[in-house]
UniProtKB/Swiss-Prot annotation:
This is Glutamine--fructose-6-phosphate aminotransferase [isomerizing]. One of its GO terms (molecular function) is glutamine-fructose-6-phosphate transaminase (isomerizing) activity. The gene is glmS. Residues 283-422, 452-590 form the SIS domain. Residues 2-217 form the Glutamine amidotransferase type-2 domain.
Length: 600
């Protein structure tokens, strides 16, 4: 949510900022702005809406070698020009952008800003006004910045300009992602490496409660006591081409097509020299020796965790609970004596999950993060990390990260089973390869998925997905995909729960999608389909080859039933994509949603 870019060097700052903000659009935003500095002063441009709207108001002729930019997701104050960042202090000396939530901004306003008239409804403006008050009281900019930071409660990533020192950007971070990018004659800061790939792939990670003084030839990291901190940089594996759509009309379609490649990369990455699936020994031992595992996730990651629970329990014989991160923080269950916590997060920055991680680490429990982003907050703060190796996922609606999470959880469960002396009964490497081939075949059947979307969803107001066992867990993910990008009210249900209330919602023409990939519940789910069809539902059965019936709408390639979620979700992703497309929705950037939810 939100995004920051800052640049200071020899190039055209405004264009670097605008291009950087475009690379952060996937994070979600409702307004955007930049501030650039030159000999004449600091010039602010901002606008409600898209980056394209911001470009329209930026002075194309202005020349500047330094600047800060921001995409805003409204948390305090409605989306508007006045609430958009950057914000300036009352006397105009300071200009600031901020991601996060300042929890005590009301108290700060009451204590320090009684005589200052605020122009916006944001917590951010309070921060820049307090900094100016401290400077007016005799502190220099660095001292005022540091003093203000010590007062802030909540999360923040901040970039600050001083109109009397326009060759420096002051930066700070706490519980909100921020990186510094290094160059020969410039330096850059951003919420995400993808915003900086246009100029550099060398980065320095910032830790919580650190501030940075950035010039075109120097980066000085300090803690909030003013002590200088030395930290090595690293070279990111990302390439600028990794975040381009290429010939695809949308990132979501590209990322759906990349799933077979990701599967094969996971197979390759998690094999040892003998071709046997492997994870670091301490991780395998932690899973095998835990008396209970708690999987923590949000949204799609939570849904992947539901599938992973089945693998760990069925194969490794370790009991598992799956929890929504935002609920766990406030309703922690009774914990076992030797738990292991597994955190699922594509970005590794999910605020709700991090809140749980902080809690369980304080209790002394071990934690494993499964993420797509090395060096992310959840990765750094957990005891162990497994990477998804899925490559950048730009579309807000997750596709390849979901299947990658399931695959990595399957690998983890298999390795833990082996460590516990349990034979899972089949060659997982071989079966994952077969699943990858099946996913590839499904990605080649887009015309059929588009036809189903047209037939069932073009004018529908709602839709239901039903399944049993593993299929039920895929149904809730399929429903989420449809609702978040097409705005159709969609819900996933366990087939057996229909008669306990949901069937009252079925009326003539209601679309009902049913998954049938598990033999032991095949007849039961087909019975549920007959129940809703008898009440007027427009039913669509998607079945696994070998369990199919003549009336099924679509038959999936044959795979090991345990891995069917990897395959059955692909048609649901594509159906959701085409439904959104035909309804005129913004597939990659659906309304009100953010890719990386970095505030609680």
């Amino acid at each position: 949510m939100c995004g920051i870019v800052g640049y200071i060097g020899q190039l055209d700052a405004k264009e670097i900022l605008l291009k950087g903000l475009e690379k952060l659009e996937y994070r979600g935003y409702d307004s955007a702005g930049i501030a650039v500095a030159n000999e004449q002063g600091i010039h602010v441009f901002k606008e409600k809406g898209r980056i394209a709207d911001l470009r329209e108001v930026v002075d194309a002729n202005i020349e500047a070698k330094a600047g800060i930019g921001h995409t805003r997701w409204a948390t305090h104050g409605e989306p508007s020009y006045l609430n958009a960042h950057p914000h300036q202090s009352a006397l105009g000396r300071f200009t600031l952008v901020h991601n996060g939530v300042i929890e005590n901004y009301v108290q700060l306003k009451q204590e320090y800003l009684q005589d200052v008239e605020l122009k916006s409804d944001t917590d951010t403006e309070v921060v820049v006004q307090v900094i100016e008050q401290f400077v007016n009281g005799g502190l220099d900019t660095e001292e005022a910045f540091r003093k203000t930071l010590t007062l802030l409660k909540g999360s923040y990533a901040i970039a600050l300009f001083d109109n009397e020192n326009r060759e420096t950007i002051f930066v700070a971070k706490n519980k909100s992602p921020l990186l510094v990018g290094l160059g020969d004659t410039f330096n850059v800061v951003a919420s995400d490496a993808m915003a900086m790939l246009q100029v550099t792939n060398e980065y320095v990670e910032l830790m919580d409660k650190e501030m940075v003084i950035v010039t075109d030839d120097q980066v000085v990291i300090k803690n909030l006591d003013g002590d200088v901190i030395s930290r090595a940089s690293y070279i990111a594996e990302l390439d600028a081409s990794d975040i381009e759509k290429g010939t695809y009309p949308h990132y979501m379609l590209k990322e759906t097509d990349e799933q077979p490649v990701v599967m094969r990369k996971i197979i390759q990455t998690y094999q040892d020299e003998n071709g046997k699936l492997s994870v670091p020994g301490d991780i395998a031992a932690a899973v095998a020796e835990a008396d209970r595992i708690y999987i923590i996730g949000c949204g799609t990651s939570y849904h992947a965790g539901l599938v992973g629970k089945q693998y760990i329990e069925m194969w490794a014989n370790v009991p598992v609970e799956v929890h929504v991160a935002s609920e766990f923080s406030y309703n922690m269950p009774l914990l076992s004596k030797k738990p292991l916590f597994i955190f699922l997060s594509q970005s590794g920055e999910t605020a709700d999950s991090r809140a749980v991680l902080v809690q369980v680490k304080a209790l002394g429990h071990k934690a494993l993060t499964i993420t797509n982003v090395p060096g992310s907050t959840l990765s750094r703060e957990a005891d162990y990390t497994l990477l998804l190796h899925a490559g950048p996922e730009i579309a807000v609606a997750s596709t390849k990260a979901y299947t990658a999470q399931i695959a990595v959880l399957a690998v983890l469960a298999s390795v833990a089973a082996d460590k516990n002396g349990i034979d899972i009964g089949f060659d997982l490497v071989k079966e994952l390869g077969i699943a990858a081939n099946a996913m590839e075949a499904l990605c080649d059947q887009k015309d059929e998925m588009e036809m189903i979307a047209r037939e069932y969803l073009t004018v529908s107001r709602n839709a239901f997905f039903i399944g049993r066992g593993l299929d039920y867990f895929v149904c809730v993910e399929g429903a989420l995909k449809l609702k978040e990008i097409s705005y159709i009210q969609a819900e996933g249900f366990a087939g057996g729960e229909l008669k306990h209330g949901t069937i009252a919602l079925i009326e003539q023409g209601t679309p009902v999608f049913a998954l049938a990939t598990q033999e032991h519940v095949n007849l039961s789910i087909r019975g549920n389909v007959k129940e809703v069809a008898a009440r007027g539902a427009n039913t669509c059965i998607i079945s696994l080859k070998g369990l199919d019936d003549a009336d099924d709408r679509f038959v999936l390639p044959e795979v090991n039933p345990a891995l069917a979620p990897l395959v059955s979700v692909v048609p649901l992703q594509l159906i959701a994509y085409y439904a959104a497309l035909h309804r005129g929705c913004d597939v990659d950037k659906p309304r009100n949603l953010a890719k990386s939810v970095t505030v609680e």
